[in-house]
Amino acid sequence: EKNPELGVEIRLLQVRAQIMFPPIVSRPTFFLRKKPRQIFSLEDYKAQGALSEKYYGIILDCIKKRKNIIVAGATGSGKTTFLNAILKKLSEINPEHRLVILEDLPELQCSSDDVQYMTTSGNRTTSVTMQDLVFISMRLSPQRILIGEVRDKSAYDVLKAWNTGHPGGFCTIHADGCH
């Protein structure tokens, strides 16, 4: 009852697990989420009719001009999958950029030459928060700071980092739309 939930990553299997026990659920629950084996490209989205030529061009322009990109959507809508496609394009356009990727659990996949992955520690006694990672990442001389999912207090820190010499960041947020 003291710790009724646990989120873990099983790296060998490339699986993320969320385990919950009463009292936060009515019965023990175990949820698995597997990392995709294939990373879709923006061109794949275009070919499937999920991305118009107009928005494809806008995204390419944003990558090239180091504009920040926020991918918004509901749970399970494909935010991370789409962000991985944007990362794939970034790796093609600017493979030399020093990237720092911050996540709660590793989900983003990037083939750039110079990438540093950092994850929060979900440990209840000693923890490294997303706010901490944003602060630390700014000391690593990144050209871009990319965040798997921005929520809560870390949103302010991310915006601050992007606007203090680290433009061209990407992130996802939970939202019903862009307004």
Regions found by a protein language model. Give the residues of each.
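Conserved glycine(s) of the Walker
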Residues: 78
